[in-house]
Amino acid sequence: MKWSAQATLAIVVTLSITATNHAQGKTDVVTLANGDRITGEIVQLERGRLVFKTDDAGTLYLEWDKLSSVVAKRIVEVLTTNGSRYLGSLGRTADRSIVVVTAGDEVPLEMWEVTLITPIGRSFWRQLDGSIDAGFSYTRSSGVAQLNLNSDTVYRKLASRTRLTASLTQTQKDDGSGRDDRASLETSYLRYPWQRWFFLGVGRFESNESLGLELRSQIGSAVGPRLVNSNRAQLMLGAGLAVNDERGVDVEPRQNLEALLMFGTSFYTYDRPTTNLDINLQYYPSLSDAGRQRVQLDAAIKREFWKDLFVALTLYNSYDNRPPNPAADTNDVGVVLSIGWTY
């Protein structure tokens, strides 16, 4: 009986805590510009859009510049345009402003200054964001069919981000002649140890038959500033080093040490329909093979056409002035139209 009473008490306490946490999760309040108030749970603010979960209306996507105020009793991480980070609950002050209530202070902020809000203590799965898209084309005159797949998954924690991306292009010709398949898998860890500066570590595996590359295994790191961080755009520059092992077609393996210069920018709008433009450029001048240069350009524009579904136009350009196999092409360029889903 004693054990039964203790077990019953433990179950009651557990259910009480669960119910309390559930109730707390739905006590955030947003006020629209017209004065309407909505009660729910902040999922995330990023790229000018607040994801807000409600019991009655499901998940809402609210434009940040169309809100008057946001109040949250839970602890959240707040990032501003100048790179400052705060942990605390959110209180209301004047319209178009919030106050971050920290352990020993209150920090007033204009809402246009806030670029990221992430609740602390979310489960692993709820901290994942990403997208997947696919495209297919067939040209009858040339007898060429092409399948394209892309995926991007991001896991966010306090002042850091872990990302996994994958890309695959398979080409089939009716006459069975040479293939132009390409594939890449990349994982990266990005952290902001200083207010505006980031550290990036990257591991990448790729193959490209057009460039005579069976497999390139690469690790690298870079540091740099985030020059722009707003609800409409981001701009980052970085520099570092990369080492790789290359296995070319019909050639001996070789290892390389390269410098790494990188540029990344994003532009986005959440006036329906939502649109994102992302451009990433990496330049690799070789330090172990003087004169060799590699460039990787990836650009994509995505436009939402229904809820979490989007259409994407992607451009990629892989350049190597000295590919592993001297007989291979030095450039591989492609444009892909695809349909995808964000999660």
Placement of each model-derived feature along the sequence:
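Transmembrane beta-strands of outer-membrane beta-barrel pores
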Residues: 136-140, 157, 168-172, 205-209, ...
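Repeated loop/turn-to-beta-strand initiation elements of outer-membrane beta-barrel proteins
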Residues: 158-164, 192-199, 230-235, 268-277, ...
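Transmembrane beta-barrel strands of outer-membrane/channel proteins
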Residues: 132-138, 151, 164-170, 185-189, ...
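Membrane-embedded beta-strand positions in outer-membrane beta-barrel channels/transporters
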Residues: 131-133, 146-150, 182-186, 216, ...
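Solvent-exposed loop/turn segments connecting transmembrane beta-strands
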Residues: 137-146, 173-180, 207-215, 249-253, ...
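Outer-membrane beta-barrel "beta-signal"
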Residues: 331-343
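Detector for outer-membrane/organellar transmembrane beta-barrel domains
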Residues: 232-285
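Compositionally biased alpha-helical segments
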Residues: 23-156, 163-167
